[in-house]
């Protein structure tokens, strides 16, 4: 058949068939080569990918410990850097006062700056050195109370009352009896301790200075004398410490009042709780509301921390005894610092005094013997300051001494001025005729 087919072809057709056969053979060879070499290339690619994954895995295994080690050393470096004792000081700005303005009696922390208080008026200076407001008045001896963005200034043994905010004067009033003490709430409501010959009154004023005709009367021969008092942040609660004589023995009682609708329902006197046995033989010298629910009472011999979470049933949460005479206390919204004599024989060689810090819950953070005798103390930001005349010391909330400073002029007051304390901290130093902002690092 093939022979018949071959003889039927023309000469030119044979050549075409030969070429076609050659092309088929060529294509077969190329296909075989592609299959063989393609498989080899695929095998090579897979091997390379596997080697790449293996190398990446090794790099990850090596790099992760190195990263953790680096972070650990950086954290350790930051920890020791942030806890080191500061040794350098630089001045950021200085605001000077005239001789008349320099006759200041006192400085107080207010909002982010300080208030300079004198017989002729008060000035509010922000932490940037800007004078925000200046309130003129004439008072023989001004008394002040500050709570958040509000402050009250009254004339001791007089009747004038000024209520101010960070923006300036809010209200002004007159008291019917001489003013002894003030306590202002975080909303501007003012409680004023007024006195006459045989009685004392705690009267309430609105932030505009209007007498609200709400008050507490105590007869000194029976109820005793109010040693100190404090209102809560919202102005609805009042804590008062009374001292009284019983069989010729001086005693103390602490009374909680509530001036909201809850207190009104309790009774006409608005008393929701009282504590006497807790302070038997003690003299209560200071009381203060940290918040609307947490407060403390300071007496000779220790501290008591109270809760008014249940508004009609105050509760003593914790009592902390303090050996030695309590010389000074200071506080902010969250902490309470105490400066006392050191009576512990084991610590006598480390200092004659003790510095203690408590949370508002009553938790003791530290109790540290120190040798420096400051005449004033302030807690501000995350620092505690002890100072007198031309020297001051700065402690952190772990009890570490961070800076030991001196000044050329007598130091009236100081406070923290830092928003962020990485690598150092900034302070406002207040002198008779000027205020300085400095950085210690």
Language model regions located:
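Secondary-structure boundary elements
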Residues: 233-236, 262-264
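Terminal alpha-helical anchor/extension segments at protein ends
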Residues: 60, 65-76, 158, 199, ...
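Surface-exposed loop/turn elements that mediate protein-protein interactions on large endomembrane-trafficking
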Residues: 75-98, 120-136, 158-174, 201-219, ...
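Short beta-strand elements that form the blades of beta-propeller/WD-repeat-like
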Residues: 105-118, 122-123, 144-156, 160-162, ...
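N-terminal targeting leaders characterized by basic, low-complexity, disordered sequences
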Residues: 1-44
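N-terminal "mature head" segments of proteins
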Residues: 36-165, 171
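Repeated scaffold domains used in trafficking and secretory/extracellular systems
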Residues: 99-109, 137-149, 177-188, 221-230, ...
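Intrinsically disordered, low-complexity linker/loop segments enriched in Gly/Pro
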Residues: 191-192, 202-221, 228-230, 238-240, ...
